[in-house]
């Protein structure tokens, strides 16, 4: 039996129907189901809840944000994630809802591959050097201003060496997986998702002399704001974070625990870029996006 943990987004109207189809399908594929606690209102009060260490694969029903949340729930156990897209973009997910049955049949038959995606370890150190917050990021870690239209002046170091002083609205520290997220919007490079690098991209830099950097995965990056608005924030994968103060330090390095994402081999990263992000301007005809 394959132990399948289900993570879903209650905001999608089609979720109850997808869950009903999943529960009908599970016995035929020898799948045992458990659900995150928030899904019990649609999966049923008797639905078993996901227990850490007791699932073989996480099935996400939603969009990219749902997959990012599942990666955080995984807590570094390296459980493969199979993403079913119920949303609009679905860049990280594997396939749309109408292909869920085929995807699960192939997974049950062992007809799949796993891509191990690099993640980032992010820590906030207070003015005394004490660790006060800690996360793992699949996409990115962003230090940015809050509600005031005032730039942040910050010093960036890599492996103890000064890189530059940045004057910008913020800074994005991204993985290759996250290179097509906020990093891309901020003018950063697209990096093939299975590579291992740390991307440093300023947000609306107040100079023409600063450009994005691609660092070795072994780099330890320190960001120390020197001046700026009182309201600073650190945001991780666009979902969690904390306030941040002048005198504190953001430390980002490669995490030792990657996130395994299930793929089925059809299509390519570049086909997905063309189909989802309109890379190159015109999509190719009869093209299969990455799955």
Where are these regions (language model features)?
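Catalytic core of DAGKc-family lipid kinases
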Residues: 89-169
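Short glycine/serine/threonine-rich phosphate/pyrophosphate-binding segments
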Residues: 15-16, 65-70, 180-185
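A residue-level signal for conserved active-site and pocket-lining positions in enzyme catalytic cores
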Residues: 9, 59, 63, 85, ...
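Gly/Ser-rich helix-loop-strand patches that form or flank binding pockets
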Residues: 69, 74-87
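Short glycine-rich anion-binding loops that position phosphate/pyrophosphate groups of nucleotides
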Residues: 11, 64-66, 89, 177-179
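ATP/nucleoside-binding phosphotransfer catalytic cores, i.e., glycine-rich phosphate-binding loops
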Residues: 143, 159-162, 209-291
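Gly/Ser/Thr-rich active-site loops/lids in small-molecule metabolic enzymes
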Residues: 165-209
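ATP/NTP phosphate-donor binding region
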Residues: 1-57, 61, 98-113, 124-135
């Amino acid at each position: 039996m394959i132990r399948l943990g289900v993570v879903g987004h209650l905001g999608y109207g089609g979720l109850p129907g997808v869950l009903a189809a999943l529960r009908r399908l599970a016995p035929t594929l020898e799948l045992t189901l458990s659900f995150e606690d928030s899904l019990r209102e649609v999966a049923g009060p008797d639905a078993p809840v996901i227990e850490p260490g007791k699932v073989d694969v996480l099935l996400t029903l939603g969009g990219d944000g749902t997959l990012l949340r599942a990666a955080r729930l995984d807590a570094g156990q390296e459980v493969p994630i199979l993403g079913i897209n119920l949303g609009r973009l679905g860049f990280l997910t594997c396939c749309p809802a109408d292909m869920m049955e085929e995807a699960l049949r192939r997974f049950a038959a062992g007809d799949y591959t796993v891509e191990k995606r690099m993640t980032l370890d992010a820590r906030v150190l207070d003015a005394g050097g004490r660790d006060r917050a800690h996360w793992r990021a699949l996409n990115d870690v962003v230090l940015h201003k809050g509600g005031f239209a005032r730039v942040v002046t910050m010093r960036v170091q890599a492996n103890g060496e000064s890189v530059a002083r940045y004057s910008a609205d913020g800074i994005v520290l991204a993985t290759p997986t996250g290179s097509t997220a906020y990093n891309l919007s901020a003018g950063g490079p697209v990096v093939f998702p299975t590579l291992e690098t740390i991307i440093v991209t300023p947000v609306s830099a107040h100079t023409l002399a600063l450009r994005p950097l691609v660092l070795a995965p072994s780099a330890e990056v320190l960001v120390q704001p020197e001046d700026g608005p009182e309201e600073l924030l650190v945001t991780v994968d666009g979902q969690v974070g904390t306030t941040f103060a002048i005198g504190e330090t953001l430390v980002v390095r490669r995490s030792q625990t990657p996130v395994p994402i299930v793929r089925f081999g059809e299509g390519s990263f570049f086909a997905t870029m063309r189909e989802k992000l309109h890379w190159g301007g015109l999509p190719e005809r009869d093209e299969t996006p990455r799955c």
